[in-house]
Amino acid sequence: MSDITKNITNSGLEQISFKQNSMIYKVNEKPKFAYYIYTGEVEIISKNDYVIGTLKEGELFGEISSLFNKEHSVSAKAATDTRLLIIEKKVFFNKVENADPILKAVIRTLSLR
């Protein structure tokens, strides 16, 4: 387990599990959370039902829709039995505000692109 995963796991975030082939969210749904993959794999699926990417342990997804209150432009499905950590918008922004100043600058720059 990576140091990042250990830190995130110990942060008190709620965990949620999905069985293989379960939909996490569908295109055009309103976002509820950003998700951190604790174990398993998640497929990102286009509007045309093409798998455009597979995310693995330690990766984050759903953050853009969640942070900017935009409907999901893709769907997310558990490719394997998967455990996710739920990251609420207020928790994410709180972590950004308490981050190192250089990291905050990087996050702000990336969010503008």
Predicted regions and their residues:
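Polybasic "coupling" helices that flank or enter modular domains
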Residues: R108-R113
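Cyclic-nucleotide recognition modules
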Residues: T54-I107
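Regulatory nucleotide-sensing modules
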Residues: M1-I45
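A sequence-level detector of short linear motifs
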Residues: Y25, I52-G53
